[in-house]
Design a protein with these regions (language model features):
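Flexible, low-hydrophobicity surface segments
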Residues: 1-105, 126, 206
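Alpha-helical support elements that line or immediately flank enzyme active sites
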Residues: 1-22, 54-75, 145-217, 263, ...
Length: 307
């Protein structure tokens, strides 16, 4: 939780034009709940390492970095869970999915076909094993980001966003909605993209930030995530771990499959899709159960599209 956030020194640096805040100090926002005013620290809480707090627009990248270093920020560390492999740790921390009424843990998928226990007992060969793969970043060669400019010369403001995106046709509406523009007043350009793989379908908060800083300064603003932030913030592929039992006949015919899966897709508490397991094979007897751990790590995004 952010307890202090001071950008005055950053703004005072020669060559710095503006500072954009993604977050605020705890206690800043108050909302009414059941007729009472309560503090809402949602936007004062960083949910994972790498979540954006502030951005600086300056004459050069070096000056912008000086501005970022001049920002004073302090945090209170909150309880957190980051070990995606530790199913029992996730349970102990109450980071699984639970039924609202009973409080019982609820699997994401719990599917049985046939009688896998009987098939395993009668099989000629039984193999058990533990398998898994950790969360993986998309590793886009070109990081996420945008270059934004405004034109105030016409009847109303228009925005041009040169955006690293797989979705030129839809991100314009996201910029328009955020800034209260007509869709026709936003132009999105992406002549090439240095990798997206399913992770570049949104205007994103950094795109909005670039556009807002451009609007505030009356100058073009280019905001691209640095490599460290690129690996943490704009989405990853969920992790998946599994204890698997496979049964077969002597001639190699698979007769049964049992698997218990878990992993994380970040704060939402999902994992890989258990409904797709076992992939390719379709044994006549199977039981698949999957659970997700809600972790204080970056969120997931689609993993696909060889571009």
């Amino acid at each position: 939780k952010i307890t202090r956030l001071n950008v005055d020194k950053a703004k005072a640096i020669k060559g710095v034009h503006t500072v954009y805040l993604f977050k605020e100090v705890a206690g800043t926002t108050v909302k009414e709940v059941d007729g009472k005013e309560v503090v809402d620290d949602t936007n004062a809480t960083c949910n994972y390492d790498g979540e954006l707090v502030a951005a600086v627009a300056a004459e050069t990248a070096d000056i912008a970095e000086d501005g970022v270093r001049a920002i004073e920020v302090a945090y209170d560390v909150l309880p957190h869970v980051v070990d995606e492999t530790d199913l029992e740790g996730g349970r102990a921390a109450k980071r699984m999915k639970y039924d609202r009424d009973s409080g019982e843990e609820v699997p994401i998928v719990d599917r049985t076909v046939g009688d896998p226990d009987k098939a395993i007992k009668e099989a000629d060969v039984v193999h058990t094993g533990h398998y898994g793969i950790h969360t993986i970043s998309h590793m886009c060669l070109e990081p996420h980001g945008a270059h934004c400019t405004w034109d105030e010369s016409g009847d109303g403001p228009t925005l041009t966003a040169r955006h690293s995106t797989q979705a030129v046709s839809t991100t314009g509406a996201q910029f328009a909605g955020h800034f209260g523009l007509d869709a026709g007043d936003v132009r999105v350009i992406c002549n090439y993209i240095g990798g997206g793989f399913g992770s570049k379908f949104a205007a994103d908060i950094w795109g909005w930030a670039a556009a807002q800083m451009s609007k505030d300064t009356g100058r073009p603003v280019r905001l691209m995530l640095d490599r460290a932030t690129e690996l943490k913030t704009p989405g990853t592929r969920p992790s998946g771990f599994a204890n698997v039992t496979v049964a077969a006949t002597k001639d190699g015919k698979v007769t049964a499959w049992k698997s218990e899966h878990w992993g994380t897709d970040g704060p939402k508490g999902g994992t890989i899709d258990g409904n797709q397991m076992p992939y390719v094979f379709d044994p006549p007897n199977k039981h698949v159960i999957s659970r997700g751990i809600s972790t204080d790590c970056g969120p997931n995004r689609a993993w696909r599209a060889p571009n």
